[in-house]
């Protein structure tokens, strides 16, 4: 039986890893061993930062809602508490968007929440 070597398989695997490693500094984009490590770290950072991104956006929305609420004579916590008591279910993303793009609607929500 003929000896089976893995040249074709290895070449394909190396090409795939080096293609993903484009743009990395120095040997990180040229040497297979370094490219594997860079790819692993890059994927770990990407996984972590997908979670962090959600946190950052929620913080940004809360800050925007608080700033708009203070323009309407209340605070973020009083506004959110009032909305919950009034039974108005609007998520923070929509509230922040209203605060920036439709101040009249946000003011109306504030009045309902504080009534």
From Swiss-Prot:
Gene3D superfamilies (alphabetical): 6.10.160.10, Ribosomal protein L20
InterPro entries with a match to the protein in the record: Ribosomal_bL20 (IPR005813), RIBOSOMAL_L20_CS (IPR049946), Ribosomal_protein_bL20_C (IPR035566)
GO cellular-component term (any): ribonucleoprotein complex
Record carries keyword Ion transport: no
A Pfam family the protein falls into: Ribosomal_L20
GO molecular function: rRNA binding; structural constituent of ribosome
Domain of life: Bacteria
Transmembrane segments: none
Protein role: Binds directly to 23S ribosomal RNA and is necessary for the in vitro assembly process of the 50S ribosomal subunit. It is not involved in the protein synthesizing functions of that subunit.
Family to which the UniProt record says this protein belongs: Belongs to the bacterial ribosomal protein bL20 family.
HAMAP family: Ribosomal_bL20 (MF_00382)
Protein name as catalogued: Large ribosomal subunit protein bL20
Species the sequence originates in: Bdellovibrio bacteriovorus (strain ATCC 15356 / DSM 50701 / NCIMB 9529 / HD100)
Gene: rplT
């Amino acid at each position: 039986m003929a000896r089976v070597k893995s040249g074709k398989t290895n070449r394909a695997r190396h090409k795939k890893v080096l293609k993903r490693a484009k743009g990395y500094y120095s040997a990180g984009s040229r040497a297979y061993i370094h490219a594997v490590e860079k790819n692993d770290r890059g994927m770990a950072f990407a996984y972590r930062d997908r979670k962090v991104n959600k946190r950052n956006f929620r913080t940004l929305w809360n800050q925007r809602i608080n700033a708009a609420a203070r323009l309407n004579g209340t605070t973020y916590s009083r506004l959110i508490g009032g909305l919950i008591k009034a039974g108005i279910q609007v998520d923070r993303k929509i509230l922040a968007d209203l605060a920036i793009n439709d101040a009249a609607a946000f003011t109306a929500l504030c009045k309902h929440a504080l009534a």
